[in-house]
């Protein structure tokens, strides 16, 4: 359900933090999940649904967005071991009507970050590491 609406029920304790990352404290009965984090924004003119899109944290360009993404994912990987994060969901893969938080534009024509570096970040390995 995401914080701050914690109900202390179910098998998962879920947090939604922007940009994050953050991990709730897991318990013997409940796994910790970061249900939403990220929200890095890079509006691309000519590829937005609306001129009024917003994002949680605006990047200056592709290089800056890639670096921010790498930092977020590196910190997220650290949370796997302490406190024991079981899962994380980056928000969001594509821009939507009113939000420019996607890694790809609304029309799916522009990828907003370096894919090879993002792939390495997603696997928890810096670029150049096997």
What is each of the regions a protein language model found here?
Residues 22-130:
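Substrate-binding clefts and catalytic carboxylate motifs of secreted carbohydrate-active enzymes
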Residues 1-12, 71:
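Active-site neighborhood of glycoside hydrolase catalytic domains
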Residues 9-17, 29-32:
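Active-site regions of enzymes building and remodeling cell-envelope glycoconjugates
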Residues 2-3, 14-26:
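Alpha-helical scaffolding within the catalytic cores
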């Amino acid at each position: 359900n995401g914080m701050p609406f914690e109900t202390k029920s179910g098998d998962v304790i879920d947090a939604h933090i922007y940009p994050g990352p953050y991990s709730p404290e897991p318990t013997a009965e409940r796994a910790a999940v970061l249900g939403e984090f990220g929200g890095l924004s890079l509006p691309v003119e000519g590829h937005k649904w609306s001129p009024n899109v917003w994002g949680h944290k605006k990047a200056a360009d592709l290089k800056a967005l890639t670096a921010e993404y790498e930092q977020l994912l590196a910190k997220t990987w650290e949370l796997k071991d302490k406190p024991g994060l079981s899962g994380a969901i980056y928000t969001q893969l594509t821009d939507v009507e009113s939000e420019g938080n996607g890694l790809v534009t609304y029309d799916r024509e522009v990828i907003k970050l370096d894919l090879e570096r993002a792939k390495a970040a997603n696997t928890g390995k810096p670029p150049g590491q096997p």
